[in-house]
Regions:
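Conserved MFS/SLC helix-loop-helix module at the cytosolic interface between two early adjacent transmembrane helices
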Residues: 64-103
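Extracytoplasmic
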Residues: 14-46, 124, 233-241
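Helix-loop-helix hairpin linking two adjacent transmembrane segments in secondary transporters
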Residues: 134, 139-191
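Helix-breaking motifs and short loop linkers at transmembrane-helix boundaries and internal kinks
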Residues: 45, 77, 98-103, 315-317, ...
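Residue-level signature of mid-helix packing/kink "hotspots" within the transmembrane helices
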Residues: 31, 59-67, 152, 276-284, ...
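Extracytoplasmic gate region of multi-pass secondary transporters
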Residues: 33-34, 213-273
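Intracellular juxtamembrane helix-capping segments at the cytosolic ends
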Residues: 118-131, 333-348
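Cytoplasmic helix-loop-helix junction between adjacent transmembrane helices
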Residues: 108-145
């Protein structure tokens, strides 16, 4: 049976650019939560427990809507799902900007989370349609790599806006404007046919069959643990450095009168930004290297180095920890895309549903992150940060022994 997701190997460069821009926006919307959570807590005078509902609401959206969006994509195609996701991101961002109470902000973040889920669930397999299938892993790595710039930009944009007298919510207004522009572009864009045929449309029995498939199970667990560890590391770098190395948040690399001090007033804030920036750079470098080196070899090397860098960050002195945390971000650059594309390349159909199943596993970002914080509260942040090590070790094991196909030319 022919796969409707790969009928044409024609390259759709314009749609690839638009999809990449969507990924930049959802990167901003994902990482900005960690930047504004303390501002949210202060402005609305809520407890840390209430403030923690922001990331929980965001990742809960993945768990609740990934599979429905995957089914919708297989039935109606990528365009409808991408339009829905972009519209929800715009609506949620506008609601957040105009909200005057904390409940509305939490609801807006949940709506944004649903929109981001839709874009990622449809976008990840859709990228395979936009170029030759043999370039899928490299293209997905490149698009997510450029999109990861959004993760690095939010720690920059919010302080700059506030230094110019704007509210921290202004970033949501700017994002909403961009989303509306993308919505108009996508509405009138011509999409390649990517709908499943009538005989390929999924039912619950097919969903159950996919859910039990060994590759979906093992790699789905890999997504769960990887995203959880990524969140568990990046969200607790500042807490770890404060507790373990007594690094005050006010300590900076620059003088107080400089512009860089206003943007990155602390060393730890800079390292968090570098974690995401180096991850983005690493994805673009890896995308280029995949033209010449086996995707699996690149995956093995980077996943092994991720574990080594994190161990150095946990065990090293202040300087070693700062550098190693930034390098951990760099070496995680291919893990998500390699795990995801290995599953997609292993099946000739049902890519929307598979994307939905894998997207559901992203809820690990909330659960593993919570576990890191809980262990850190009870036994200290060295133990808390160490929770991420076995998660990254599992990803390394997948890179070596996993049965998924990283290259469509693999036997």
């Amino acid at each position: 049976m022919s796969n409707p997701m790969v009928r044409s190997e024609k390259k759709h460069s314009f749609l690839l650019v638009v999809t990449t821009l969507m990924y930049v926006i959802f990167g901003l919307l994902t990482s900005v939560i960690g930047v504004v959570i303390d501002r949210f807590q202060t402005e609305y005078n809520v407890s840390l427990a209430v403030a923690a509902l922001l990331p929980l609401a965001f990742f809960l959206a993945y768990g609740l809507t990934s599979i429905p969006f995957g089914m919708l994509m297989d039935r109606r195609g990528a365009k409808l799902v991408l339009l829905t996701g972009t519209g929800l991101m715009a609506a949620g961002a506008l609601l957040c900007y105009f909200s005057d109470n904390y409940v509305a902000v939490i609801v807006s973040v949940f709506l944004i989370g649903i929109g981001v889920t839709a874009v990622q669930i449809a976008g990840n397999p859709f990228i395979r349609v936009l170029d030759a299938p043999s370039r899928y892993t490299a293209n997905l790595t490149m698009v997510i790599g450029i999109g990861a710039l959004g993760y690095a930009l939010s720690p920059l944009i919010v302080p700059v806006l506030q230094s110019n007298g704007c509210s921290w919510k202004t970033i949501y207004l700017l994002i909403a404007i961009v989303c509306i522009a993308i919505l108009l572009i996508v509405t009138f864009a011509q999409f390649p046919e990517a709908k499943a045929g009538e005989e390929e449309r999924l039912d619950l029995s097919r969903l159950w069959t996919l859910f039990r498939h060994p590759i979906v199970c093992t790699y789905g667990l890999g997504i769960f643990l990887y995203v959880g560890a990524e969140v568990g590391v990046s969200s607790y770098i500042i807490t770890f450095m404060n507790e373990v190395h007594h690094l005050d948040n006010a300590q900076s690399f620059w003088g107080e009168a400089s512009f860089l001090y206003r943007v990155f007033p602390s060393k730890t804030a800079l390292i968090v930004a570098l974690f995401w920036l180096l991850q983005a750079v690493g994805r673009m470098v890896a995308s280029f290297l995949m033209r010449f080196v086996s995707e699996r070899r690149i995956f093995i090397f980077h996943s092994a180095c991720t574990v080594i860098a994190l161990l150095c960050a946990i065990a090293g002195n202040e300087t070693v920890s700062l550098v190693a945390f930034a390098l951990t971000g760099y070496f995680t650059c291919v893990s998500f895309t390699s795990v995801f594309s290995a599953v997609i390349n292993s099946f000739d159909r049902d890519h929307g549903m598979i994307s939905g199943l894998l997207g559901t596993a992203i809820v690990g970002g909330a659960l593993v992150g919570w576990l890191v914080g809980s262990v850190g509260n009870r036994w200290g942040m060295v133990a808390g940060m160490a929770v991420n090590v076995p998660a990254f070790l599992y990803v390394f094991a997948l890179s070596v022994w996993g049965k998924g196909r990283l290259d469509v030319n693999d036997n």
